[in-house]
Amino acid sequence: MEVGQAASGTDGVRERRGSSAARRRSQDEPVQSGMNGIPKHSYWLDLWLFILFDLALFIFVYLLP
């Protein structure tokens, strides 16, 4: 009886190791971004808006008074 229990116990451990290894593998895979990611042109838009804001601030602070 003990041999059967030991064999089933090691099988259970192997099954658990296999499932945890499968979970570990799925967690290590890179996550692909979907369609809701940030578009590439938004960085350029942010840069241009920053430059325009700086120019407007320069005009109001230094040239108008």
Curated annotation (Swiss-Prot):
Residues 1-38 are annotated as: Disordered. It is found in: Endoplasmic reticulum membrane. The modification N-acetylmethionine is found at M1. InterPro entries: ALN. It is a single-pass membrane protein. The modification Phosphoserine is found at S19, S26. Its main location: endoplasmic reticulum. The chain crosses the membrane at residues 44-64. GO terms for cellular component: endoplasmic reticulum membrane. The keyword DNA-binding does not apply. The keyword Metal-binding does not apply. Inhibits the activity of the calcium ATPases ATP2A2/SERCA2 and ATP2A3/SERCA3 by decreasing their apparent affinity for Ca(2+). Homooligomer. Can also form heterooligomers with other sarcoplasmic/endoplasmic reticulum calcium ATPase (SERCA) regulators ERLN, PLN, SLN and STRIT1/DWORF. Monomer. Interacts as a monomer with ATP2A2/SERCA2; the interaction results in inhibition of ATP2A2 Ca(2+) affinity. This is Sarcoplasmic/endoplasmic reticulum calcium ATPase regulator ARLN.
